[in-house]
Swiss-Prot record:
This is O-phosphoserine--tRNA(Cys) ligase. One of its GO terms (biological process) is phenylalanyl-tRNA aminoacylation. The gene is sepS. InterPro entries: aa-tRNA-synth_II, aa-tRNA-synth_II/BPL/LPL, O-Pseryl-tRNA(Cys)_ligase, Phenylalanyl-tRNA_Synthase, SepRS_C. Catalyzes the attachment of O-phosphoserine (Sep) to tRNA(Cys). The lineage of its organism: Archaea, Methanobacteriati, Methanobacteriota, Stenosarchaea group, Methanomicrobia. It comes from the Archaea. Coiled coil: none annotated. It is an enzyme of class 6 (ligase). Homotetramer. Interacts with SepCysS. Its EC number is 6.1.1.27.
Length: 539
């Protein structure tokens, strides 16, 4: 809270120790639900794949490569030019783009009657306007998502009525079937490189060093732990009349060394794609220490991580490219799996989807989901809660029956005296579980005493909810006393006995934590004898 510096300086000159000690009053005391760890500073996290993409971009730029964006939509004729006799096999794994045809819609007398029945009598002029908009749609002058607004604007009727009219009067719109085009989504970055390099030569002279990191699409038979139908390719090219296979080896080492790879093996690729010069297509195997001993088939530290080769003159000639081109590519997701210790590409890419990813909440995250249910709403109510806790701390071991005054003052316009009491004989003011604390430990939410037995559970302060049973009870008592003051009651007693569930001691668990604990067969265990009461007497 704010304070007056001049007054503080004056008071400090008169009595420094007193002023220093009273500095505590200048610091706001958080309410139970404002305590750490519920008060937290959240931070954004980059997605592992995009994080890896950014690191790859920086790595390529450091090596002197210039970034380029290649065409994503590629006509099948380009695939034939690039892959030759392999084109059909490549196209078999491509996604073709399709679109809905635009029907030639006629308006008969029967349909005119239906239109007038839905929109009201729009007359011959209105029907003619509908005809013109439908004709413009057929010719491609009006887009599909503009059809309803265009008719609505022409007739000055609501979009909802027009949409209803189209659905009921023109059922052919609902019966449209998509028709495939010759356009495909690229399955290899290579498809884009040929187009880009061929076009660039009209304006620039080689040598060129380019890289591109972008999506590719491949119609896999199924997705699994190592394959997705859409993935990111981190690809580069060097166009230079003197480029060789050794340039590919050098680029592989220079790029991958920046990600912790230490040793490299280069092996001829058995695939022998027709867009590469024979015997230049090379697989890159690299050693990464993070893989050693991992629970994967790469536990020896070695993994196939990239492929490079020299583009074939027969493919380059189709684009009038007169220079050799070295191309290297790697899958971003595979690299991201190594950097982020991910065993499954699906869970790495789509961690939010339950079928792909195990749900994990840390003890710290669970602790943030623990709250006090009823809390006082006035400053006086908060003072009452603090006073009840203070008396229980001072006199909790006192034998009963007993009563200790806790607070006296005015609440909601009424004078009140608050005491902590235990009327039963042969017990104590507070039961043995009164000072249990709420902690999360190994996925469980527990109410336990801070004793040697539970020492491990209290080592992580971020997993401690910062709530004791007695504090939650005192908050409920204070809130009920506020309500009693407003209702005109003469006396109000709040009791807590043996607690079996969190709600019996005024504690609630967030719905997310409850779902997680139920799904993981973990437990919420808050039990124990608290046995104390707070009494309010109003004047």
């Amino acid at each position: 809270m704010r304070f007056d510096p001049e007054k503080i300086k004056k008071d400090a000159k008169e009595n420094f120790d007193l002023t220093w000690n009273e500095g505590k009053k200048m610091v706001k005391t958080p309410t139970l639900n404002e305590r750490y760890p519920r008060t937290t500073f959240r931070y954004g996290k980059a997605h592992p794949v995009y994080d890896t993409i950014q690191k790859l971009r920086e790595a390529y730029l450091r090596m002197g490569f210039e970034e380029m964006m290649n065409p994503l939509i590629v006509d099948e004729k380009e695939v034939h030019k690039q892959f030759g006799s392999e084109a059909l096999a490549v196209l078999d794994r491509c996604f073709y783009l399709a679109g809905l045809p635009r029907p030639n819609v006629g308006i008969s007398d029967e349909r005119i009657a239906q239109i007038n029945g839905i929109l009201g009598d729009i007359g011959d002029e209105g029907i003619d306007k509908v005809r013109k908009v439908l004709h413009a749609y057929k010719k491609g002058k009006v887009e599909g998502d503009d059809l309803v607004p265009e008719i609505s604007a022409a007739l000055e009727v609501s979009d909802a009525l027009v949409a209803d009219m189209i659905e009921k009067v023109f059922p052919e719109f609902k019966e449209l079937v998509a028709q495939a085009s010759t356009k495909t989504l690229r399955s290899h970055m290579t498809s884009g490189w040929f187009i880009s390099l061929g076009a660039l030569l009209e304006r620039k002279e080689p040598p060129f060093h380019f890289f591109s990191i972008d999506r590719c699409f491949r119609r896999e038979q199924q997705e699994d732990a190592s394959r997705l139908m859409t993935y990111y390719s981190a690809s580069c090219v060097i166009m230079d009349e003197n480029v060789t296979v050794d340039h590919g080896k050098a680029v592989a080492e220079g790029l991958l060394s920046q990600f912790g790879f230490e040793k490299f093996l280069f092996r001829p690729d058995e695939k022998r794609s027709k867009y590469y010069v024979p015997d230049t297509q090379t697989e890159v195997f690299a050693f990464h220490p993070k893989l050693v001993g991992s629970n994967s088939k790469y536990s020896d530290g070695w993994i196939e991580i990239a492929t490079f080769g020299i583009y074939s003159p027969t493919a380059l000639a189709e684009y009038d490219i007169p220079c050799p081109v070295m191309n290297l590519g790697l899958g971003v997701e595979r690299l991201a799996m190594i950097l982020h210790d991910a065993p499954d590409i699906r869970s790495l890419t789509y961690p939010q989807i339950p079928q792909y990813s195990e749900w994990e909440m840390s003890d710290s995250e669970l602790a943030k989901q623990v709250f006090v249910d009823k809390t006082p709403e006035t400053p006086e109510g908060r003072e009452i809660a603090d006073a009840v806790v203070a008396q229980c701390e001072l006199h909790g071991e006192e034998p009963s029956p007993c009563e200790f005054p806790a607070w006296e003052g005015e609440v909601c316009g009424r004078k009140v005296k608050v005491s902590v009491i235990e009327p039963e004989e042969n017990t104590k003011l507070c039961g043995p579980a009164a000072f249990n604390e709420v902690v999360t430990y190994q996925g469980d939410i527990l109410g336990i005493p801070n004793t040697k037995k539970w020492q491990k559970a209290f080592e992580n302060h971020s997993a401690m909810a910062g709530i004791r049973f007695i504090e939650a009870f005192a908050a409920q008592a204070a809130r009920e006393i506020e309500e009693a003051a407003m209702s005109g009651a003469d006396e109000h007693i709040v009791r807590v006995r043996i607690v079996k569930v969190p709600s019996e001691v005024n504690i609630k668990i967030g719905a997310t934590a409850q779902r997680y604990i139920t799904g993981k067969n973990k437990k919420i265990d808050m039990r124990g004898p608290i046995f104390t009461s707070a009494k309010a007497e109003f004047e």
